[in-house]
Amino acid sequence: METPVRLWSQHLANLARAAFWLLLAVVILLQLGGSRGIDRQRAAALGQFERERSSRVIAMIHRQEGASLLGVPVAGSISIDDSEAVLRAIRLTPAEQPLDIILHTPGGLVLAAEQIAKALVERKGKVTVFVPHYAMSGGTLIALAADEIVMDANAVLGPVDPQIGDMPAASIVKAVAIKGPRNVSDEMLVLADIAQKARVQVASFVVQVLLKHMPEKQALQVATVLSEGRWTHDFPITVEAARLLGLKVSTEMPRTVYDVMDLYPQGGGTKPSVWYVPLRRAPAQAGSTSQPSPDTRPEGGNAAR
């Protein structure tokens, strides 16, 4: 016969289990509801941009978002899933219609980036890539395929030199050349062979992409600079540097692009590390100069935009 104390303990355990499952259900429902709400806002913002530009707009934005079941941050990068989605959107867009891509990415899979870039090069309508903050590595490869690149004045592109695992292909080849083939392992020799092939492949592809916008000699020079590994992989190519390379770059970034970026907040659930009071411009009156007035609501974010 069970004692009252044991019965009471079992009752508490049952209540605790029920409370746990109830809390889990509430968390899931809140996440689903919040996700649908932000998706509607994003669709509305992209729709507004399409109306402003009379174009098809595709956003490929890789943020570290709380995308998992319990809000654990998941960092994004260019993947095969991304290339499939972008190619599908391009197929659904009339050939002559302008195509605008909002691009914010650290890079990702070379194959996926090359698929997207090839599809953009083959477009008949004008292709414009907007880079509000950065488009590195594979993101730069996609940007090179555009007829025009619109960058924020402080935005950056990056080198497209291939990486073998966590190591730059150019550095692998250089290391083997310094030590000599007889003084390195078979594994390193295999890596060096793969690295050299990757360098040739990427450089060749960049040339093919750039031939749409510049002479072959210039395209070869630009491809060499971007893919030979003269810089570290995170080297920032600024607006000025991109123009010196011969890329067609504008800094006339539409306000709507920043509005779209605001709908992709940096995830993680941590306290923002950057705080500021945004300025709000008062309506201009006749005979007076409008001055920005501070919004009394402080805003915070993980990166200034």
Please identify what each model-predicted range represents.
Residues 137:
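Catalytic nucleophile serine of serine hydrolases
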Residues 132, 140-147, 151-153:
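Internal, hydrophobic cores of structured domains that mediate oligomerization or house catalytic pockets
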